[in-house]
């Protein structure tokens, strides 16, 4: 009887947490290749999770376009829960840059009334309207989400807060605070109401 020999594991498989450790330390340049190794060589479930982690590291590194492509690929290859996760993450990663129509197309598989991801997709679409300045539409959608008894309590509270915020005018400047005076020779400061870093 031949002796059983263990085949060597690929580098990424020996330390599958390396990518996560690097990402958590902020070293996205080294985290992405580590996730890619696991995604390439690990069994399917681990590979898909590594791809989602790789895309998350790309988002944090400011490489949203690349991340969205990975999220879309994961969604295209999965019909279960990972598909929903991937599409929601793709939606949030692109909500500020993608036209509303394209965002609707991206999230369409999740908006069916029987889909458990429908509330998360609705929140992204409402935020898209808010971000693009369609405040009345955003307020209406956030209120509908807040009133939806099937949504989670956390999501309903968050949607209710956004609906109330938008109903009261959001970040509109009512003139109660004078606009900042730009410094001599320097760039103008942001308008009143703009969040500061």
Regions found by a protein language model. Give the residues of each.
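Single-pass alpha-helical transmembrane signal-anchor segments
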Residues: 1-6
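Short extracytoplasmic
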Residues: 11-52
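Short, well-ordered turn and helix-capping elements at secondary-structure junctions
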Residues: 20-23, 114, 191-194
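Soluble extracytoplasmic domains of inner/organellar membrane proteins
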Residues: 42-51, 56-184, 195-197
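Low-complexity, polar/amphipathic intrinsically disordered segments that mediate membrane, lipid-surface
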Residues: 187-188
């Amino acid at each position: 009887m031949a002796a059983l020999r263990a085949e060597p594991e690929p580098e990424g498989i020996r330390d599958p947490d390396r990518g996560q450790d690097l990402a958590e330390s902020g070293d996205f340049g080294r985290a992405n290749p580590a996730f890619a190794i696991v995604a390439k060589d690990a069994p399917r479930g681990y590979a898909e999770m590594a791809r989602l982690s790789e895309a998350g590291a790309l988002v944090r590194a400011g490489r949203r376009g690349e991340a969205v492509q990975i999220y879309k690929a994961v969604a295209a290859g999965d019909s279960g829960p990972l598909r929903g996760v991937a599409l929601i993450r793709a939606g949030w990663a692109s909500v500020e840059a993608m036209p509303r129509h394209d965002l609707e197309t991206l999230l369409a598989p999740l908006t069916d009334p029987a889909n458990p991801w429908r509330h998360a997709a609705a929140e992204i679409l409402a935020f898209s309207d808010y971000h693009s300045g369609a405040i009345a539409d955003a307020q209406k959608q956030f209120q509908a989400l807040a009133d939806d008894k099937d949504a989670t309590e956390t999501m309903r509270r968050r949607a209710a807060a956004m609906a109330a915020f938008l109903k009261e005018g959001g970040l509109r400047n009512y003139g109660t605070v004078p606009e900042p005076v730009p410094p001599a020779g320097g760039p103008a400061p942001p308008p009143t109401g703009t969040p500061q870093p």
